From Swiss-Prot:
Transmembrane segments: none annotated. It comes from the Eukaryota. This is ATP synthase epsilon chain, chloroplastic. It comes from Euglena gracilis. It is a peripheral membrane protein.
Amino acid sequence: MTLDVSIIIPERVFWEKRVEEIILPTLSGQMGVLKDHIPILTGLDIGIILVRQKSSSDWTSLVVTGGFALINSNNVTILVNEAEFGSEINVEQAQISYNSSKHALEMNKDIKRKFELTLNLKKARARFQVTQLKK
């Protein structure tokens, strides 16, 4: 038996697959989900979703920017603001974005902008980290 996973962004259903295992970036840390998981609704942080598809040892990685996951009856429904496949992210651009986001936060003197810059850094970090998983 497997899990039916749907990742939904505001514009459309981004990705639907039958998978063996999924690891989610929840607000309280990473959470692995296998078949027959207890029902749960959890908040998702900016981070990396890892998915192992049926009959495979390979993992698919996606970067998501916050949202929710509902796990019920071997269905995983993920609602996020943005999603992007790790395999489609340019390594050099991700590193440049990460470094510039980090620098912008370090140089920030405006308390009001700190929250926005912190979110930008988390997203840039996740995009850069997912490129390192491809190696």
